[in-house]
């Protein structure tokens, strides 16, 4: 009987140990779960903060996207001011005033073109006598020209411009009708 009692006590001790081990395991799993939940909340908060920061930066980039371009245009505006100041002097005769004004306008055009090129805007290059391209040109006039084939460009009326690969404005041209 003592053996039976001892066996029962030993069985009870083993059950208690097993239960204690399971309880310890359960506590460890709960602790790990809590740690994972805390990590998740931190990562989620970091993600939300990053998302908000990127949205703010995007809005600022859009708001100030033209700032660099505007700064590049300021020298052209300065040239116009200087040209006006140069022709405003009373001691210039009409011919000198026109020369100064022409010089100022040419300088301004050069500065505009430099600012445009710096920002990815280019003049669409066209050769008179070249073929009309509806993607780059807009035919404003058709003219009789015995020296040119039908569809050849006779004259560039207004320059065209492109921004990178997009056409901002097609070049306005006159084209030959051709011989009928």
From Swiss-Prot:
GO molecular function terms attached to this record: adenyl-nucleotide exchange factor activity; protein homodimerization activity; protein-folding chaperone binding; unfolded protein binding
Subcellular localization(s) per the UniProt record: Cytoplasm
Keywords: Chaperone, Cytoplasm, Stress response
PROSITE patterns, alphabetized: GRPE
Compositional bias annotation for Basic and acidic residues: 1-19
UniProt entry tagged with the keyword Chaperone: yes
GO biological process: protein folding
Any one GO cellular component localisation term in the record: cytosol
Region (Disordered): 1-25
Superkingdom field: Bacteria
Homology family: Belongs to the GrpE family.
Assembly behavior: Homodimer.
Function: Participates actively in the response to hyperosmotic and heat shock by preventing the aggregation of stress-denatured proteins, in association with DnaK and GrpE. It is the nucleotide exchange factor for DnaK and may function as a thermosensor. Unfolded proteins bind initially to DnaJ; upon interaction with the DnaJ-bound protein, DnaK hydrolyzes its bound ATP, resulting in the formation of a stable complex. GrpE releases ADP from DnaK; ATP binding to DnaK triggers the release of the substrate protein, thus completing the reaction cycle.
NCBIfam families on file: PRK14140.1, PRK14149.1
Protein name, UniProt field: Protein GrpE
């Amino acid at each position: 009987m003592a053996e039976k009692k001892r066996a029962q006590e030993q069985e009870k001790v083993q059950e208690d140990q097993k239960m204690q081990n399971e309880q310890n395991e359960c506590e460890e799993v709960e602790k790990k779960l809590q740690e994972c939940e805390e990590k998740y909340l931190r990562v989620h908060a970091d993600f939300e903060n990053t998302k908000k920061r990127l949205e703010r930066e995007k809005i600022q980039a859009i708001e100030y996207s033209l700032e660099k371009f505007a700064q590049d245009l300021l020298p052209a505006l300065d040239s116009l001011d200087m040209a006006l100041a140069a022709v405003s002097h009373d001691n210039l005769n009409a011919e000198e005033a026109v020369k100064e004004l022409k010089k100022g306008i040419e300088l301004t055009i050069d500065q505009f073109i430099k600012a445009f090129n710096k920002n990815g805007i280019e003049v669409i290059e066209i050769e008179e006598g070249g073929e009309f391209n509806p993607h780059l040109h807009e035919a404003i006039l058709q003219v009789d020209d015995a020296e040119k084939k039908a569809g050849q460009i006779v004259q560039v009326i207004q320059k065209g411009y492109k921004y990178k690969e997009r056409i901002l404005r097609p070049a306005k041209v006159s084209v030959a009708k051709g011989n009928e």
